[in-house]
Regions:
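GST-like domain detector, emphasizing the conserved glutathione-binding G-site
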Residues: 1-127
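Intrinsically disordered, low-complexity polar regions and short flexible loop motifs
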Residues: 206-214
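GST-like fold's C-terminal all-alpha helical module
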Residues: 99-207
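Alpha-helix C-caps/helix-loop-beta hinges
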Residues: 51, 78, 168-169, 184, ...
Length: 223
């Protein structure tokens, strides 16, 4: 039995990526939901304030989802998330998903994420807005919420080619790998409110999301 601890925010797409990789590899792990306002346990464990952070069996705690993924595949290589012949393509796709696509989906999901932190309390909501507006500029949250339709249209345009690609395959490159987990994490933005908001007409993408979501340790050959 492994002894791993994942420090996370539930709404983080990068934490969702790491959770699904751990599930795919069949690893036992404990989840610590970090309080957005009180990160002392995360700081004590990792020496920094960013999630995801993963404490390994050795006691070392590492941060950054890309680094965590690489270390996990080195320590627990079966099943691999980096099929040898496609490793570079998986890494390139993951960087795109965690960059341009992340920006689009984050903006599309911002109303749901604001509502999530509001449910946690006024202090959490205020601090969330402060962090976002320190990064993107004053008034960012309100402006982005008002532009929600445009944000959803941009997300739709970026997701449509992926839906088309998945028409004739179970996973992005045929065999499951790191890019699938990165995309899964980002699409978690569209489930923050509870209902999955991948457009209904994107049946291939919705089916793919379901396949990845059901992964625990080994992939059901029937899926």
């Amino acid at each position: 039995m492994t002894n791993l601890t994942l420090y996370q925010f539930r709404t983080s797409p990068f934490c969702a990526k790491v959770r699904k990789i751990l599930d795919f590899k069949g690893l036992d792990y404990r989840v610590v939901e970090v309080d957005y306002l009180d990160r002392k346990d995360l700081l004590a464990a990792s020496g920094q304030l960013i999630v995801p952070a993963l404490t390994l069996e050795s006691g070392e705690t590492i941060a950054d989802s890309d680094r965590i993924a690489t270390v996990l595949d080195d320590l627990y290589p079966v099943p691999t998330i980096f099929p040898l012949e496609w490793r570079g393509i998986h890494l390139a796709l993951a960087r795109y998903f965690d960059g341009e696509l992340e920006d689009a989906l984050f903006r599309a999901a911002l109303p749901d994420e604001i509502a999530h932190y509001a449910r946690l309390g006024r202090g959490h909501a205020a601090f969330y807005r402060l962090i976002r507006e320190r990064k993107y500029g004053a008034g960012f949250c309100d402006v982005t919420v008002r532009a929600h339709d445009a944000a959803m249209a941009r997300a739709h345009d970026l997701l449509a080619p992926l839906d088309a690609t998945l028409a004739d395959r179970a996973f992005l490159l045929g065999r499951i790998g790191y890019a699938d987990f990165a995309l899964y994490g980002q699409l978690g933005y569209l489930a923050i409110g509870g209902d999955l908001k991948i457009p209904a007409e994107m049946e291939n993408l919705r089916a793919w999301y379901g396949r990845v979501d059901r992964i625990r340790a080994t992939l059901d050959p029937e899926t």
